[in-house]
């Protein structure tokens, strides 16, 4: 994602960004992917320098019942149990979903924070991230889903962006119009001072934008160290398929300490120094 695009996202949504004290920065940026930097699970591969999360046939069309996950190879510390400090973080990525039949696309892609060593979870509507639509603290998983199929047991009636906390049943959703086969520019931020998780998505080709936010106390929901990355699934019934590609990805996080009192805006840092 170009830094100018992220700047547009920031100005459009006027995100409430962190004012926590500065400290060590964990950051990375991929404009071309290589398998050595990732833990690839299920059907996920690195293909033509992009993350291809679900299986594609030789003719480029997606397959049924595919599940793939890709996580950054190094754990990320998101809080410090000994001091109580909590990290603010921001991530941006460009994703592309293509459904041969847009009216029957399934199932979606998620950005997820999971326990280190986590294995793929249930297929189809669970997006490979969860096993249940009932809250379960032992899952220790927070995700932002970009859901292309409405599962009547737990989803709203339309495609949506959702914030998921230890369950596939989102605690907050916003309707989302899929721009089929078009790139989506996504920015997700977490403000440790307010516990506010914000996800925004822009389709530059259509000049459409979407945003969802909710407060999440990650110290109650996640382990101290997590793996971060992506998970995606396709449907189980004929015709309910789509491709899921991540074309670029950047991340920055900041865990406060007492060595400095100068505020740092983590999302601005991401734009200036990582992208």
UniProtKB/Swiss-Prot annotation:
Keywords: Calcium, Glycoprotein, Lectin, Mannose-binding, Signal. SUPFAM superfamilies: Concanavalin A-like lectins/glucanases. Glycans are attached at residues 34, 101. InterPro entries: ConA-like_dom_sf, L-lectin, Lectin_LegA_CS, Lectin_legB_Mn/Ca_BS, Legume_lectin_dom, Leguminous_Lectin. This is Lectin DB58. One of its GO terms (molecular function) is D-mannose binding. Leu-264 is missing in a major portion of the beta subunit, suggesting an origin by sequential removal of amino acids rather than a processing by endoproteolytic cleavage.
């Amino acid at each position: 994602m170009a830094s100018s695009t992220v700047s547009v996202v920031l100005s459009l949504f006027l995100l409430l960004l962190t004012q926590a004290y500065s400290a060590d920065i964990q950051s990375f940026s991929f404009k071309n992917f290589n398998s050595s930097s990732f833990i690839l699970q299920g059907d996920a591969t690195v293909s033509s320098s992009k993350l291809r999360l679900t299986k594609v046939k030789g003719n480029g069309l997606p397959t049924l019942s595919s599940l793939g996950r890709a996580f950054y190879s190094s754990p990320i510390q998101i809080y410090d149990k000994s001091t109580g400090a909590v990290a603010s973080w921001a991530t941006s990525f460009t994703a592309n979903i293509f459904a041969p039949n847009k009216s029957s696309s399934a199932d979606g892609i998620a950005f997820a924070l999971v326990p280190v060593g986590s294995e793929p979870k249930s297929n189809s509507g669970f997006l490979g991230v969860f096993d249940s639509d009932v809250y379960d603290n032992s899952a220790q998983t927070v995700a932002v889903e970009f859901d292309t199929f409405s599962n009547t047991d737990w989803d709203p009636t339309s495609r949506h962006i959702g914030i998921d906390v230890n369950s596939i049943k989102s605690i907050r959703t916003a309707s989302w119009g899929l721009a089929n086969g078009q790139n989506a520019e996504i920015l997700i931020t977490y403000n440790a001072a307010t516990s506010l998780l914000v996800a925004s998505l822009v389709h530059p080709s259509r000049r459409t934008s979407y945003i969802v936010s909710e407060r999440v106390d990650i110290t109650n929901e996640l382990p101290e160290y997590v793996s971060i990355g992506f998970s995606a699934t396709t449907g189980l019934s004929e015709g309910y398929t789509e491709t899921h590609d991540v074309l670029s990805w950047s991340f920055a996080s900041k865990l406060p300490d007492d060595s400095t009192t100068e505020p740092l805006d983590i999302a601005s840092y991401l734009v200036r120094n990582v992208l």
